[in-house]
A protein has these predicted regions:
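Long, low-complexity or tandemly repetitive, helically biased scaffold regions used
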Residues: 1-83
């Protein structure tokens, strides 16, 4: 059986990777919002524009919430191993 330290280190490595993913997701969301802001007024305020903005926000929020939960869960597990 592997020592708890091995599992702890693997979980911490996973945390770093997940936090990097979270940062990348935030950057992508910012880029997409910037592109949305640069749409013409006609497109931005059309049904297409409203639906696009809502879809972008919903997708970002769903991924962000799941990543936050996963990070919290793994952090809790790592701290439980560390004792």
């Amino acid at each position: 059986m592997k020592k708890p330290k091995v599992y702890y280190m693997r979980l911490k490595k996973m945390l770093v990777q997940l936090k990097q993913m979270q940062t990348e997701l935030e950057q992508m969301h910012d880029e997409v919002e910037e592109r949305y802001d640069n749409l013409s007024e006609n497109r931005k305020y059309s049904d297409f524009g409203y639906e696009m903005e809502e879809a972008i926000d919903n997708l970002y929020n769903a991924y962000s919430d799941e990543l936050d939960s996963l990070i919290d869960y793994i952090d809790e597990a790592a701290n439980g191993i560390k004792g």
